[in-house]
Amino acid sequence: MISSNDFRPGVSIVLDGSVWRVLEFLHVKPGKGSAFVRTKLKNVQSGSVMEKTFRAGETVPQATLEKSTMQHTYKEGDEFVFMDMETYEEGRLTRTQIGDRVKYLKEGMEAEVIKWGDQVLGVELPKSVVLEIVQTDPGLKGDTATGGSKPATLETGAIVMVPLFISQGERIKVDTQEDKYISRE
């Protein structure tokens, strides 16, 4: 159990049988009446966001989330097969369990799999990954680093905007959280 006074961004709680992550909180002490905590919560499973007010000192169950490092070994049909790096057990995850970051997932890549009990809530990829460009328009003579950008398709199928001087076959570093080009490799 966790007190509403101990809420911080990133804390996970259980409400109505679902896991919610605290995005924002504000402890309010009005001049008249008792104090309360106004929060903005995000459902970890569905992604929906809601605002909820708790009485100051009210206790709610805290969600115990487990993170385990797993390696993506291969894709079979619509499922992605992961191997636990400690126990060498295999687990299968669907595209919806992984989320929209699946476009950066490459065979052999390690990721943090987040579980609540036996239920997989999501997958955290590394902040940046190095991938090869398989298709992009060729750069023209005179293109500079500040000249603009063009779309490039990566080996995983993801499309990111890259500077005009980047060409097909090059390896680039991409920010997986903001879908942005970082640098050449």
UniProtKB/Swiss-Prot annotation:
One of its GO terms (molecular function) is translation elongation factor activity. The gene is efp. SMART domains: EFP (SM01185), Elong-fact-P_C (SM00841). The keyword Electron transport does not apply. Pathway: Protein biosynthesis; polypeptide chain elongation. This is Elongation factor P. One of its GO terms (cellular component) is cytoplasm. Its main location: cytoplasm. Keywords: Cytoplasm, Elongation factor, Protein biosynthesis. It comes from Nostoc punctiforme (strain ATCC 29133 / PCC 73102). One of its GO terms (biological process) is peptide biosynthetic process. CDD domains: S1_EF-P_repeat_1, S1_EF-P_repeat_2. It comes from the Bacteria. Belongs to the elongation factor P family. The keyword Translocase does not apply. The lineage of its organism: Bacteria, Bacillati, Cyanobacteriota, Cyanophyceae, Nostocales. Involved in peptide bond synthesis. Stimulates efficient translation and peptide-bond synthesis on native or reconstituted 70S ribosomes in vitro. Probably functions indirectly by altering the affinity of the ribosome for aminoacyl-tRNA, thus increasing their reactivity as acceptors for peptidyl transferase. NCBIfam families: efp (TIGR00038), PRK00529.1 (NF001810). Pfam families: EFP, EFP_N, Elong-fact-P_C. It is found in: Cytoplasm.
